[in-house]
Regions:
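Acidic, histidine-bearing metal-coordination/catalytic regions of metal-dependent phosphoesterases
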Residues: 1-16
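Core catalytic region of metal-dependent phosphoesterases/phosphodiesterases
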Residues: 13-16, 20, 25-109
Length: 109
């Protein structure tokens, strides 16, 4: 019997799996983060036609404090791009890192 907590991903033929991590948006400053966010979005645009699954495995953001009732301002480009990709059928799995632990179940909500 398969553990119900384990998700089995079926790959589409001729599609790839991508593992992304350590964007650290928010550090060291707003300008650097904006430039990095734009590069990440361009990369996601390049891979969207051959991606089956994307795993974001920690530290997408870089915040050393917890948000319990609000969402940090900014990064709408990246969040919108991730929504666009999931709407197109690409599975995205997000794991929190030590710099973005506040995320917890943000994407599920």
């Amino acid at each position: 019997m398969i553990n119900p907590k384990i998700t089995i991903c079926r790959l589409q033929q001729q599609k790839n799996i991508y593992f992304l991590s350590d964007f650290h948006l928010g550090a060291p400053n707003a300008q650097s983060s904006l430039e990095r966010e734009k590069r990440i979005c361009r990369f996601l645009d390049r891979i969207k036609n051959d991606a089956s699954v994307i795993f974001i495995v920690g530290d997408m953001f870089d915040f050393w404090f917890e948000y319990s009732t609000v969402v940090p301002k900014g990064y709408v480009r990246l969040l919108g791009k991730l929504a666009e990709l999931t709407d197109s059928g690409i599975a995205i799995h997000f794991f929190v890192g030590n710099h973005d632990t506040w995320m917890k179940n943000y994407f599920q909500q």
